[in-house]
C-alpha cells in the first residue's frame, strides 16, 4: 500500500482527495482499483478521526459510496444463459463515480487556468485617465437629430451618383478650397431660403468629388458651432439642413 503522506487540510472535498489518491497510484481514472482506493480513503478518514478532527459529512457519504462500489465489484457474477440477440454491456459500478471525478477535474483545471490568468494580469498596470480640461475651448458639440452614420450614408450615396454620372473623359483641374470658404457658402445658400432650410443633397449640387468632401467637412464644423442642424422626419426619409443663429438673421 502507498504510504499516506499528505496534509489533512490540503483537500477541498472528497473528490479532490480521490483524485490525489488516483494520481499517487498512477492508475487510469477510468479503471480505478476500488479495493486499494477504498482502503486508502478509509485510512484517511480514520486519521482525521484519530486526530479528533471533525469529519465533514461529505467525506462520510463518499466513504459509504466507495464501500458500496467495492462490495458490488467483489460479488460473483451470476452465470446466466446468454441471449446474444439482446446482449447488453453490463454497467460498471464505477461509472457514476468516474463521471463525477471527471467533471470535478474539469472544473478544477478551469479554476487553475483562471487563477494563472489573474496572476498574469497583476503584472499589468492601467494608466489613469488624463485630465484634458486644459484643452477644452468651451465649445459645445451640437446634439444631432440624426446620427453621423445617417449623414455618412447619405454622403456616400452622393459620391456613388457622382461617380456614375462622371463622363468617361474629364479634364482635371486643381482648385484649393478652404473649409472656411465652404462654410460661408453653405450659410449663404441657407440664407437665400425663406425658412433657412435645404434638402441635404441640394448643398452638394454641381460639385467635384473634392468639393463634396470639403462641403461635408464644412457642414460638420457648422453643426459643431451650432450654426446648423440636420433633421430627419422619420427613418429613411430625406435629410434636411436647417440654419440657425445670428448669421442667418
UniProtKB/Swiss-Prot annotation:
GO terms for cellular component: cytoplasm. GO terms for biological process: cell division; chromosome segregation; DNA replication. It comes from the Bacteria. It is found in: Cytoplasm. Keywords: Cell cycle, Cell division, Chromosome partition, Cytoplasm. PANTHER family: SEGREGATION AND CONDENSATION PROTEIN A. This is Segregation and condensation protein A. It comes from Listeria welshimeri serovar 6b (strain ATCC 35897 / DSM 20650 / CCUG 15529 / CIP 8149 / NCTC 11857 / SLCC 5334 / V8).
